[in-house]
């Protein structure tokens, strides 16, 4: 420390003496992460003189060295008295730290040897003024976890290289937590795990299976797409080792998400799918009742896997070709399972997501998902993230084209996840890293990355020719032995297994494939989880369901959720809202939207049905209407009345989400597909922003049941309505959802009264059918004086897919019927009343899909004589329901009647940006709909 900039400053500062140790610790934190210290201290440390001063060593290591040295009387005089030795000791500790920080840059990670990183100067002893003459000198090793307090420099250097520059490259010094860093150091510096002969033979057998399946498929179905794992074969022993280790650590469920690369191999060699079933899929055979189906490398699978610690249930999530989107779906599924156990931080459920090197750094949903990893409503106790890093994305292999970071896994540093790079040609290193990563996740409940550095033996798919764009890489690959061959040769040299043993493994596996039965010894038939979905099969949208709540109980619930303890100091406007709700409960006021919605949740949790509501502002509601969560104005605490109904109630969980649409909606889809007993709701801040999650809507929500047989009762609340707020705050793009509707795949509703939203939400939870519900929820109607409902309408009513004329018009005098949905109804109603018109009836369609033909025919029955029908909408002609639903409108109006459009003209933008233009357009469309010539 004689040359330390910090020491020079302390010697000339009044901040010394008793404060010196504290300041040294603060400076050590600054060296690790400048942002971790207060801005004033950071500014002070940054101003320390740098000229002629070598990089500072962590002072705790130096202090520890001298502390140990002082206790060693036999060496005290000879060591302490030599100032040169003291300086070199500090340099040795600097060298150790350099390997911890940057040793991974010299690690032997690339099986092909093509990936050459720049030399790191501070890994060379000479950088620290240490020469070969010092190699035989003995130095204290500080906190280096070798099991020794002192080592010769040459021995220490070799240990550092083996630890940090071998087939494993560890990145963890970016982590702020000292405890986590020391835990990792202890595990990796204390020596690699040793494996017995049986374990090594098992690794060889699993590599044999990985290679054997790919070769078998290549021979049996030449040219067919299978997205081979070859080159990354170590994924199979990695996954099986992780499942075994997880089972021994108390895990009872593992949920996997992965893309196409190696998926068929995982299905057969990990989850135990019968090879014959896979062969049938290659041959084009399929079961007729499974809907449209999907390609084989998108299909999911479930099974049980026997470990020494007990059975582990495995679930591989279904996924589309859209890379990385399955990751938040998996996390949502895991959170649902943990909530079912009521153990949100339990190790009983393990999420494993498998990524590609190009996709993990290229797809923004990865960042969104990582950002959720420690958020209260979304955390799952950490995810093990495996990157199959075959160093090429389709045809892009130059890192300068693929990313802007040295490693594809650098994104993991945003959540301070440790990153373990490992050479996929070394299955023992892979197994060591697998156990290490899982133990870290289980210990610290954090995400962890494994970068499985490998290669892709064939093209992106088997019909592709990769040498056109990667000539040098594929010249090397053609000459490179397979991972199985490399490891078989190694075990022969170790006299663990002969080449004859290895050949026998190959033959036995091929025979097992010929037989077509399960090839996974640990596979067991599923004996749990199968009950979950049976009550929800074979239901229709319009079937009867138990909907009634006794008036007395409804009043009790309304009173309970509007009563707040005196200790909770409410904000004045919130107090006014809760006062109004007490009046609603007493029958003194009609229910507004927020009151009816909250009461719907209360009735459900009262019956033991859990409710999960999430969105960017869901606790309060974007438009200040819900206030399910009350914020105490005196101390900042929160109170949720819906969580205080009675002890045996269903859980009510409301979460203000991270600012994301894509990952959060995918998470909620995963949650809903894993837990049908919960009413799962995602609310967009504005419906306009939901298209940030369009891939989730297109690939999962609208089509998941037809492609994969996956039912989902997710509710999407999308605030929608034209109120002059411009093109980004007016439209939830109703037309896009209607365009996706077919085969009764989902429901699209536009409720217009508090009673309707009350019954709609209850119907979604109580009815047996589990299909997505897309709701064009209101904004201005939340406080509209006409958009109110009585307690009797809540108690005795039901959801009406169509609502007829409410004013007392003489049907015989009606010349025109205007059909509409949503807020525009009230504009039409008020204008008609203002005009004192009696010749125009207004009919609301509250459910646009599945279209309520029967209900509409009943509503229109009294207008059978009318020949003039109008569809009125706020949206432009090319948007809204007109184009997608007019064939339904025509089907329910009387034969021979005409149908005309009243609404905004076609527009490239959803809405105008000028209030005056908006108001004129709105008045024009209302007048157009009502004016009878």
Swiss-Prot record:
Domain of life: Bacteria
UniProt note: phenotype after gene disruption: Impaired growth in minimal medium containing acetate as the sole carbon source.
Group of enzyme by EC: oxidoreductase
Catalytic activity annotation: N(6)-[(R)-lipoyl]-L-lysyl-[protein] + 2-oxoglutarate + H(+) = N(6)-[(R)-S(8)-succinyldihydrolipoyl]-L-lysyl-[protein] + CO2
Listed cofactors: thiamine diphosphate
Keyword set includes Cell cycle: no
GO molecular function ontology, one term from the record: magnesium ion binding
Keyword annotations of the record: Nucleotide-binding, Oxidoreductase, Phosphoprotein, Thiamine pyrophosphate, Tricarboxylic acid cycle
One term under GO cellular component: oxoglutarate dehydrogenase complex
Impact noted for substituting residue 337 to A: Mild reduction in growth in presence of acetate or glucose as sole source of carbon
Residue list for modification O-AMP-threonine: 405
Record note on quaternary structure: Homodimer. Part of the 2-oxoglutarate dehydrogenase (OGDH) complex composed of E1 (2-oxoglutarate dehydrogenase), E2 (dihydrolipoamide succinyltransferase) and E3 (dihydrolipoamide dehydrogenase); the complex contains multiple copies of the three enzymatic components (E1, E2 and E3). Interacts (via N-terminus) with SucB, the E2 component of OGDH complex.
Function as written in the Swiss-Prot or TrEMBL entry: E1 component of the 2-oxoglutarate dehydrogenase (OGDH) complex which catalyzes the decarboxylation of 2-oxoglutarate, the first step in the conversion of 2-oxoglutarate to succinyl-CoA and CO(2).
Protein name per UniProt: 2-oxoglutarate dehydrogenase E1 component
Organism in which the protein naturally occurs: Escherichia coli (strain K12)
């Amino acid at each position: 420390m004689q040359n330390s900039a910090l020491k020079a400053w302390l010697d000339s500062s009044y901040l010394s003496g008793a404060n010196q140790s504290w300041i040294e610790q603060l400076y050590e934190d600054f060296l690790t992460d400048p942002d971790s210290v207060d801005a004033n201290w950071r500014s002070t440390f940054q101003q320390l003189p740098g000229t002629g001063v070598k990089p500072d060593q962590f002072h705790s290591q130096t202090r520890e060295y001298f502390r140990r040295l002082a206790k060693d009387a036999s060496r005290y005089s000879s060591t302490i008295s030599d100032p040169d030795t003291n300086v070199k000791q500090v340099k040795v500790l600097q060298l150790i730290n350099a390997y911890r920080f940057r040793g991974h840059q010299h690690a032997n990670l690339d099986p092909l040897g093509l990936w050459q990183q720049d030399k790191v100067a501070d890994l060379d002893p000479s950088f620290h003024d240490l020469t070969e003459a010092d190699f035989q000198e003995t130095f204290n090793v500080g906190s280096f976890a070798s099991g020794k307090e002192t080592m010769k420099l040459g021995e220490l250097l070799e240990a550092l290289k083996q630890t940090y520059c071998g087939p494993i490259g560890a990145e963890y010094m970016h982590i702020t937590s000292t405890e986590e860093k020391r835990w990792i150091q202890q595990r990796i510096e204390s020596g690699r795990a040793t494996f017995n002969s049986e374990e090594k033979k098992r690794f060889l057998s699993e590599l044999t299976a990985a290679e054997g399946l790919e070769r078998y498929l290549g021979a049996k179905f030449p040219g067919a797409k299978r997205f081979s794992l070859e080159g990354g074969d170590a994924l199979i022993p990695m996954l099986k080792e992780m499942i075994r280790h997880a089972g021994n650590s108390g895990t009872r469920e593992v949920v996997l998400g992965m893309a196409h690369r190696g998926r068929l191999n995982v299905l057969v060699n990990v989850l135990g799918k019968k090879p014959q079933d896979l062969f049938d899929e290659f041959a084009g055979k399929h079961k007729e009742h499974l809907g449209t189906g999907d390609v084989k490398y998108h299909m999911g699978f479930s099974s049980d896997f026997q470990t020494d610690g007990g059975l582990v249930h495995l679930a591989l999530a279904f996924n589309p070709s859209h890379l990385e989107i399955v990751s938040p779906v998996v996390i949502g599924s895991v959170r649902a399972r943990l909530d079912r156990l009521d153990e949100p931080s339990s190790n009983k459920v393990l999420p494993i997501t498998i990524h590609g090197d190009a996709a993990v750094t290229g797809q923004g949903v990865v960042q969104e998902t990582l950002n959720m990893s420690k958020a209260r409503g979304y955390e799952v106790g950490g995810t093990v993230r495996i990157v199959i890093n075959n160093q090429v994305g389709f045809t892009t292999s130059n890192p300068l084209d693929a990313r802007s970071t040295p490693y594809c896994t650098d994104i993991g540093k945003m959540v301070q996840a440790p990153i373990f790079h490992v050479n996929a040609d070394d299955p023992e290193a892979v197994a060591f890293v697998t156990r290490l990563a899982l133990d870290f996740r289980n210990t610290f409940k954090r995400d962890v990355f494994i970068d499985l550095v490998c290669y892709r033996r064939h093209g992106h798919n088997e019909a592709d020719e990769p040498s056109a764009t990667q000539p040098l890489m594929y010249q090397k690959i053609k000459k490179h032995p397979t991972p199985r061959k490399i490891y078989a040769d190694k075990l022969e040299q170790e006299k663990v297994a002969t080449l004859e043993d290895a050949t026998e493994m190959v033959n036995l596996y091929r025979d097992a494939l010929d037989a077509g039965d399960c090839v996974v010894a640990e596979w067991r038939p599923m004996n749990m989880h199968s009950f979950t979905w049976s009550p929800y099969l074979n239901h229709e949208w319009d079937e009867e369901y138990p909907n009634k709540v006794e008036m007395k109980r409804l009043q009790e619930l309304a009173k309970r959720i509007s009563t707040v303890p005196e200790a909770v100091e409410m904000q004045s406007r919130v107090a006014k809202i809760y006062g109004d709700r007490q009046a609603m409960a007493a029958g003194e006021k009609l229910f507004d939207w927020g009151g009816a919605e909250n009461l719907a949740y209360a009735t459900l949790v009262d019956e033991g049905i859990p409710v999960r509501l999430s969105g960017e502002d869901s606790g309060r509601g974007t438009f200040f209407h819900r206030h399910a969560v009350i914020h105490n104005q005196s101390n900042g605490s929160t109170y949720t009345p819906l969580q205080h109904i009675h002890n045996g109630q269903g859980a009510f969980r409301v979460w203000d989400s991270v600012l994301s649409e894509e990952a959060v909606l995918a998470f909620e889809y995963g949650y809903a597909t894993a837990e049908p007993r919960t009413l799962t709701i995602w609310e967009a801040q504005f419906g306009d922003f939901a298209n940030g999650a369009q891939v989730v809507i297109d690939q999962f929500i609208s089509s998941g049941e037809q492609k994969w047989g996956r039912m989902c009762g997710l509710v999407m609340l999308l605030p929608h309505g034209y109120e002059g707020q411009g093109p980004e705050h007016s439209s939830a793009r109703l037309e896009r959802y209607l365009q996706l509707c077919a085969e009764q795949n989902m429901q699209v509703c536009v409720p217009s009264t508090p009673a309707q939203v009350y019954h709609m939400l209850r119907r979604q939870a109580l009815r047996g059918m589990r299909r997505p519900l897309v709701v064009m929820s209101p904004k201005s109607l939340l406080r509209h004086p006409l958009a109110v409902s009585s307690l009797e309408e809540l108690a005795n009513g039901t959801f009406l897919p169509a609502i007829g004329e409410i004013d007392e018009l003489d049907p015989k005098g009606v010349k025109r019927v205007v059909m509409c949905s949503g807020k525009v109804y009230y504009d039409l109603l008020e204008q008609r009343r203002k005009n004192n018109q009696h010749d125009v009836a207004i009919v609301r369609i509250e459910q646009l899909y599945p279209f309520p033909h029967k209900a509409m025919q009943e509503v229109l029955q009294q207008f059978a004589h009318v020949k003039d029908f109008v569809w009125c909408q706020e949206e432009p002609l090319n948007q809204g329901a007109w184009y997608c639903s007019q064939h339904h409108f025509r089907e329910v109006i009387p034969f021979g009647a005409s149908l005309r459009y009243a609404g905004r003209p076609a527009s490239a933008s959803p809405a105008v940006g000028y209030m005056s233009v908006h108001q004129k357009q709105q008045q024009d469309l209302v007048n157009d709909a009502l004016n009878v010539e």
